[in-house]
């Protein structure tokens, strides 16, 4: 049984004060949630403060990115160990915005994920195709390449700290959402790929999230699909009431 994971990616939003206010509003709204893992990902500067604010709650803390080196002359980067020190339990890696805007590569995603898992963080690894790739019927080719590259080199026991998030680039911040069936089709493909390339047991336990304009009015249909194990939520996670409604998708 895969525990659903609902993750809120706040992207480049909220000051420290605004992040703390959001957490204070959110905590009582999700305090009674059972059978679901909850994670929020504020900006780097708010991580430590939000970590203290989440203490004693059932909400986990994620960073939005990391670097693969532990330390050194890498100006502007943050290591997985430093994120753990700031209170993080999770880190988002390879988000489409990182790939599209900052040239993140499949190799870089793999190096970051391996470094994160090595220090005990759960890596939420993002994959997904552009609209051009979907229209040219390259969705499975692109997603397959990204998943295969991202999961290279992991040992069997490390997969418990890996989550895949399928986020079609054409649905990020556009208001467009993959239909329940479109999302399920790709999630099923990812799980079958892991079955064939790694093992049935790992595929069965691997959580695969959907990301891409997830909102309170579409999350229930998505979560009803057999291979969708949660959601990576952007804009709709910025308001406590909206995010809490999605955490409590079961009603």
UniProtKB/Swiss-Prot annotation:
GO CC term, one of those recorded: cytosol
UniProt binding sites for substrate: 9-11, 173, 213, 234-235
UniProt xrefs under SUPFAM superfamilies: Triosephosphate isomerase (TIM)
Name of a matching Pfam family: TIM
EC number of this enzyme: 5.3.1.1
Domain of life of the native organism: Bacteria
Signal peptide region: none
Predominant localisation class: cytoplasm
Pathway(s) served: Carbohydrate biosynthesis; gluconeogenesis; Carbohydrate degradation; glycolysis; D-glyceraldehyde 3-phosphate from glycerone phosphate: step 1/1
UniProt-listed GO biological process terms: gluconeogenesis; glyceraldehyde-3-phosphate biosynthetic process; glycerol catabolic process; glycolytic process
Any one GO molecular function term: triose-phosphate isomerase activity
HAMAP family from the UniProt entry: TIM_B
Function: Involved in the gluconeogenesis. Catalyzes stereospecifically the conversion of dihydroxyacetone phosphate (DHAP) to D-glyceraldehyde-3-phosphate (G3P).
Record family assignment: Belongs to the triosephosphate isomerase family.
Protein name stated in the entry: Triosephosphate isomerase
Organism whose genome encodes this protein: Pelobacter propionicus (strain DSM 2379 / NBRC 103807 / OttBd1)
Gene: tpiA
